[in-house]
């Protein structure tokens, strides 16, 4: 089994290194090949997603991704900025389903920004559609306004759109995920304002007929944002579009105490996937050895479960992380009184020891 390892920028190389150590400690034979991506790709090849990196990603059975982005690239034209690498990989590999779990471990309830009783036992899965919506809809750009109150003025415009096949496939993925969990699915939309999401709602309702054992509910995105803070444990699986999912999954991340704890998976129709932590490249702490590697290590566990069919090994890693937390090891982002503060490498070593 071949794994493409794409560390990226900022803290990416540090946290990916710890996940690779954990994978190497398993009783499995993985072929792991590393390639530059993001700012590192731009420095090496003049493009955030070099041809050889894309070729490797296409050939691999799964991709372990770090993070991309750095302020020093903000002056580049948009097509050359590091963040275009992840968008390019999603597009070329047809990664349409993003899984973002938000789990609050018992030991970390004190690190959450909410009261412990609101988040204790929290286990949400957000299923986000990745290939459509306003992020990719055409046409888009800057032009002279052709009509309206400010006709002739410069305006920016984007297009929100979803096709029926796009909605159906993400709905099926979400219903199947809910069927394996608490059998509750909440579809988040803005059907009261947007035609696109009235259409979304209609299609999701139609797909629901194939899953009679799953309870389907609907919620407007503004209310969903409020309920995630007010009563987060009322959710099990949430399915939504690209932009809403982008925002809600980051909000849900902070319910858990730190975005540094949350893995994610982006899958194609055959469960080949790209696995990455939910956080960014954090260039302000890069090289300091203080970043939390647990989200990346847990992303490696998701990779084993969804793309490599190694569920038992995934369980081993997840249980090792739970053990390390129970032992009181904490990086700075999840530190609470009475716990032992460690750095990136020490946290990785603790997980290895727990394995």
From Swiss-Prot:
> Which Pfam families does the entry link to?
Iso_dh
Cofactor notes:
Binds 1 Mg(2+) or Mn(2+) ion per subunit.
- Amino-acid positions noted as binding Mg(2+) in the UniProt annotation, renumbered to this chain: 222, 246, 250
Site-annotated residues for Important for catalysis: 135, 190
| Keywords attached to this entry | Amino-acid biosynthesis, Branched-chain amino acid biosynthesis, Cytoplasm, Leucine biosynthesis, Magnesium, Manganese, Metal-binding, NAD, Oxidoreductase
For the keyword Coiled coil, the answer is: no
Binding-site residues, NAD(+): 280-292
Q: What is its main location?
A: cytoplasm
Q: What family is this?
A: Belongs to the isocitrate and isopropylmalate dehydrogenases family. LeuB type 1 subfamily.
Check the record and name the NCBIfam families matching this protein.
leuB
Protein name per its UniProtKB record: 3-isopropylmalate dehydrogenase
Query: Which gene specifies this protein's sequence?
Result: leuB
């Amino acid at each position: 089994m071949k794994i493409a390892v794409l560390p990226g920028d900022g803290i990416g190389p540090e946290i990916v290194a710890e996940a690779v150590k954990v994978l190497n400690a398993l009783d499995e034979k993985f072929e792991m090949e590393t390639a530059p991506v993001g700012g590192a790709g731009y420095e090496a090849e003049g493009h955030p997603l070099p041809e050889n990196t894309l070729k490797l990603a296409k050939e691999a059975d799964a991709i372990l991704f770090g993070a991309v982005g750095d302020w020093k690239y903000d002056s580049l034209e948009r097509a050359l900025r590091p963040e275009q690498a992840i968008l390019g990989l999603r597009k070329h590999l047809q990664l349409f389903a993003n899984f973002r779990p938000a789990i609050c471990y018992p030991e970390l309830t004190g690190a959450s920004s909410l009261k412990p009783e609101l988040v204790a036992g929290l286990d949400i899965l957000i299923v986000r559609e990745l290939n459509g919506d306003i992020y990719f809809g055409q046409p888009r750009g800057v032009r002279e306004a052709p009509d309206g109150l400010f006709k002739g003025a410069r305006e920016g415009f984007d297009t929100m759109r979803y096709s029926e096949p796009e909605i159906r496939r993400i709905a099926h993925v979400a219903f199947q995920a809910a069927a394996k969990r608490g059998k509750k699915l909440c579809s988040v939309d803005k059907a009261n304002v947007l035609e696109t999401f009235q259409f979304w709602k209609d299609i999701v309702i139609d797909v629901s007929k194939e899953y009679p054992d799953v309870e389907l509910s609907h919620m407007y995105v503004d209310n969903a944002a409020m309920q995630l803070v007010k009563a987060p444990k009322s959710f099990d699986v949430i399915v939504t579009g690209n932009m809403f999912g982008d925002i809600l999954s980051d909000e849900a991340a902070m319910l858990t105490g730190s975005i540094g704890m949350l893995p994610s998976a982006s899958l194609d129709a055959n469960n080949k996937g790209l696995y990455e932590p939910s956080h960014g490249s954090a260039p302000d702490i890069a090289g300091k050895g203080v970043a939390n590697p647990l989200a990346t290590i847990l992303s490696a566990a998701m990779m084993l479960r969804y793309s490599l069919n190694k569920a038992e090994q995934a369980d081993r890693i997840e249980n090792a992380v739970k053990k390390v937390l129970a032992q009181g090891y904490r990086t700075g982002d999840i530190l609470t009184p009475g716990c032992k503060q460690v750095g990136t490498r020490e946290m990785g070593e603790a997980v290895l020891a727990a394995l």
